[in-house]
Amino acid sequence: MTNWNYQLTHFVTSAPDIRHLPADTGIEVAFAGRSNAGKSSALNTLTNQKSLARTSKTPGRTQLINLFEVAEGKRLVDLPGYGYAQVPEEMKIKWQRALGEYLEKRLCLKGLVVLMDIRHPLKDLDQQMIEWAVESDIQVLVLLTKADKLASGARKAQVNMVREAVLAFNGDIQVEPFSSLKKSGVDKLRQKLDSWFNEIPPQEAVEDAE
């Protein structure tokens, strides 16, 4: 199994919606989460780059789908943050439609990383993202971010509670604590990404079967 070097990850392009994304080939893994879930920090920690994904002081700034290449045909996709109160309702609906469309229609999407603040997990939109992924047979890794904010006992209790709760989705869902500050949980994230990126791209599997 190849262990991909995530430090080589570089920005490729931004797209306002699925129609403007590059060709639907290779393998993509998407990162999704509420606007304050620590998504940009997690991407920066994973790649050991300070500003690969810009951390905005204004949640909800990232309205584009941002694509980063790990290696040829292997991409990380930073989806727009969702659930920020000060974004107009019309824009919220537009984003949610774009997120749903991406999860349902993007053939090269292999896995979804859903990031949630460990203190406030499984909000409605988090559950919606997991539901969309499960409906599309996409594996999910839930990262409970800012795990350093809780003492060890409370952290374990939250992780166990979320692991129990996601059983109701009947999907392939892994739940892990994560802290960008302490760099904890990064190994689990890399292992999961490696397993996704080492699979045969869907379109190549179809060609082999013909």
Curated annotation (Swiss-Prot):
The protein's required cofactor(s) are namely:
Mg(2+)
Xref: PROSITE patterns: G_ENGB
The entry marks the following residues as binding GTP, namely 33-40, 60-64, 78-81, 145-148, 178-180
Q: What is this protein called?
A: Probable GTP-binding protein EngB
Instruction: Give GO cellular component annotations, separated by semicolons.
Output: cytosol
What species was this sequence derived from? Answer: Klebsiella pneumoniae (strain 342)
The entry assigns this protein to a family as follows:
Belongs to the TRAFAC class TrmE-Era-EngA-EngB-Septin-like GTPase superfamily. EngB GTPase family.
Among CDD domains, the record links this protein to:
YihA_EngB (cd01876)
Entry keyword set = Cell cycle, Cell division, GTP-binding, Magnesium, Metal-binding, Nucleotide-binding, Septation
